[in-house]
């Protein structure tokens, strides 16, 4: 027996499914074709039943609402009040969809911030303290022309403005423990295990940034301190060569 091919995607709720269908059909959220969306929504519910997946009451409620709105579109309009009820019902559904879309976007924003928060530290903007100059400033202004004084004032003003953090946001991220000495130590030990002599320049070439270069160098110093390796140069400013010590750990 051949079973139909059905693709089921997990949705957080009925509005998540509706937004997916609207996006899939390239519709404007403010001008949704209820009839088309209803058919696809009900098809998804049928697929869930076929796959014996649990259907929550929220999906059923929205399905009933869509069917009611669609049926009112198809039936002849008799009274003005009924037209208004139909418009209100459809309007309420669209408003809930728009609200859900906004909430979902905000939730994704905070989720990204939460995930990234473990990788960095932040600090509050610095308060620039005024410099207390001595009471007697006569020596500072001796032999200064008016133009020099004017340029000095402009330079100080520019420095002060550049130090102001008007956005109240620290743009630079300081990553925490992305490169650890312990990890580099283990990496270097594995490297010299497989090679009789290793060039430090080749290790540096594989580093992603300046910070990783520094951590690699500190790890090398730690290895020398622990008497794990011997480092030497053939000449000044030549390659730093790393060699595993045969008398490892001995004085």
Swiss-Prot record:
Pfam families (UniProt xref): SMC_ScpA
Superkingdom of the source?
A: Bacteria
Q: Where in the cell is it found?
A: Cytoplasm
Q: Which GO terms describe its biological process?
A: cell division; chromosome segregation; DNA replication
Leader sequence range is: none
Q: Which UniProt keywords apply?
A: Cell cycle, Cell division, Chromosome partition, Cytoplasm
Q: Give me the Gene Ontology terms describing cellular component.
A: cytoplasm
Which protein family is named in the record?
A: Belongs to the ScpA family.
Q: How does it assemble?
A: Component of a cohesin-like complex composed of ScpA, ScpB and the Smc homodimer, in which ScpA and ScpB bind to the head domain of Smc. The presence of the three proteins is required for the association of the complex with DNA.
Q: Main role?
A: Participates in chromosomal partition during cell division. May act via the formation of a condensin-like complex containing Smc and ScpB that pull DNA away from mid-cell into both cell halves.
Q: What is this protein called?
A: Segregation and condensation protein A
In which organism is this protein found? Clostridium botulinum (strain Eklund 17B / Type B)
Q: Gene behind this chain?
A: scpA
């Amino acid at each position: 027996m051949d079973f139909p091919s059905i693709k089921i995607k997990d949705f957080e709720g009925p509005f998540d499914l509706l937004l997916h269908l609207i996006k899939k059909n390239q519709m404007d959220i403010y001008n949704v074709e209820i009839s088309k969306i209803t058919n696809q929504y009900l098809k998804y519910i049928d697929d869930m039943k076929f796959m014996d997946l649990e259907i929550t009451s929220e999906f059923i409620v929205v399905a009933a609402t869509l069917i009611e709105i669609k049926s009112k579109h198809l039936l002849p309009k008799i009274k003005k009040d009924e037209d208004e009820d139909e418009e209100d019902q459809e309007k309420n559904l669209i408003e809930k969809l728009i609200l859900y879309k906004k909430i979902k976007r905000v939730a994704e924003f905070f989720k990204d911030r939460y995930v990234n928060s473990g990788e960095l530290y932040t600090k509050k903007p610095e308060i620039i303290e005024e410099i207390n100059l001595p009471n007697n400033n006569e020596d500072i202004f001796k032999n200064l022309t008016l133009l020099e004084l004017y340029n000095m004032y402009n330079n100080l003003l520019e420095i002060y403005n550049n130090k102001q953090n008007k956005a109240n946001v620290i743009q630079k991220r300081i990553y925490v423990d992305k490169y650890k000495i312990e990890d580099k130590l283990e990496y270097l030990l594995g490297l010299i295990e497989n090679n009789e002599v290793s060039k430090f320049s080749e290790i540096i070439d594989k580093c992603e940034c300046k910070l990783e270069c520094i951590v690699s160098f500190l790890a090398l110093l730690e290895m020398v301190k622990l008497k794990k390796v011997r480092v030497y140069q053939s000449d000044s400013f030549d390659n730093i060569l790393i060699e595993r010590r045969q008398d490892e750990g001995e004085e």
